[in-house]
Amino acid sequence: MEKVLVTGASGYIALHCITELLKNGYAVKGSLRSMNRENEVREAVKKEIPDNNLEFCKLDLMSDEGWDSSASDCDYMIHLASPFIVGEPKNENELIKPATEGTMRALKAAKKAVIKKVVLTSSIVAISYGHNQKICSSHDWT
């Protein structure tokens, strides 16, 4: 059975991805910043499908620890983990640094583990700050 590492497993989009992956016959390893959220995620998934092929690992966007070992037995990766700040961040260390460094950690671990495919996501947050009077459009991202 092919396995997918889903980072940010407690997030809204991740819960839907995990459920769909399990429904479609994949095993899932979900990463959590805090393992205290495992039961919450497991219960949410169980409302849709049995969680027999769901496991969890602890990963932090700002730490190298665990990334290589977590990815080593996976075939695919969906990188959804990213900090979310309500309101404008005080500085880039709150939002930009964890997002970019976490993405680099995910990609390096995927390369080392020879992951077949990686899916990266983004958010409107990527273009929302620093443009006070601008209406954003598709020209603001690639």
Question: What label would you give each PLM region?
Answer:
Residues 42-43:
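Beta-rich interaction modules in large eukaryotic scaffold/regulatory proteins
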Residues 35-37, 46-101:
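NAD(P)H-binding glycine-rich loop region in Rossmannoid oxidoreductase-like domains
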Residues 15, 38-39:
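Short, surface-exposed alpha-helical segments at coil->helix boundaries
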Residues 83, 89-142:
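Conserved Rossmann-fold NAD(P)-dependent oxidoreductase catalytic core, especially the SDR/UDP-sugar
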